[in-house]
């Protein structure tokens, strides 16, 4: 939420409805949520905030907290365990977040900014808090949803824009990528400078990434 205006709100609400359907429950008081949301947003008329809506069969909770934002390039470490690409709740954003929380905790303790997650086929999935994109032989690619990827909002937008295509990405291919960045609604676009000690030189593409970020900002409130 920037200066009281929520970004990509329609997409987040649709994803929440989809997640509830996958989990086989109806969100209580969904139609009345709007008035509560308006009141909550009135407290965030200036500055940047993180809005979180958590729905269950019994209740819906909305919270708003100040957010400082992400800056600079990040350093990723490959988590030492593998995740199943066929988890039943993988396609929905749920409170079943233990694997991702622990991966982020591990990364921080090891001196990384975040953890890169692989599935049990040794394929690249995502970062614990973001989706990931690579430049491969002049073409932007992102891990295929069949690898167990969570379908993030920014990832979906970039695919709709035909900016990148989904492919299966073996972890062994990491050394062959020319550039890398991660995406999330809180980050938009954030370059990756290292993965497990492997340096990535994004400098030739920073202008393009800046332009992409500006394009996302221009449609954030649509």
Cite the ranges covered by each PLM segment:
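Helix-start/capping segments and mature chain N-termini
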Residues: 1-31, 35-39, 43, 56-222
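Hydrophobic alpha-helical interaction segments
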Residues: 47-51
């Amino acid at each position: 939420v920037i200066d009281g205006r929520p970004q990509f709100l329609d997409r987040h609400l649709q994803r929440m409805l989809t997640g509830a359907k996958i989990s086989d429950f109806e969100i209580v008081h969904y139609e009345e949520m709007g008035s509560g949301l308006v009141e909550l947003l009135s407290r965030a008329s200036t500055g940047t905030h993180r809005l979180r809506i958590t729905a269950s069969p019994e209740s819906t909770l909305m919270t708003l907290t100040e957010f400082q934002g992400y800056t600079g390039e990040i350093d990723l470490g490959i988590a030492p365990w593998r995740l199943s690409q066929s988890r039943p709740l993988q396609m929905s954003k749920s409170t079943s977040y233990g694997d991702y929380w622990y991966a982020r905790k591990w990364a921080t303790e090891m001196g990384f900014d975040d953890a890169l997650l692989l599935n049990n086929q040794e394929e690249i999935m995502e970062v614990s808090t973001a989706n990931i994109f690579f430049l491969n032989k002049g073409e932007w690619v992102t891990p295929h949803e069949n690898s167990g990827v969570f379908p993030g909002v920014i990832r979906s937008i970039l695919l709709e824009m035909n900016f990148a295509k989904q492919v299966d990405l073996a972890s062994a291919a990491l050394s062959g990528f020319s550039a890398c960045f991660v995406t999330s609604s809180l980050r938009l676009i954030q370059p990756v400078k290292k993965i497990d000690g492997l340096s990535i030189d994004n400098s030739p593409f920073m202008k393009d990434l800046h332009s992409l970020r500006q394009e996302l900002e221009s449609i954030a409130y649509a």
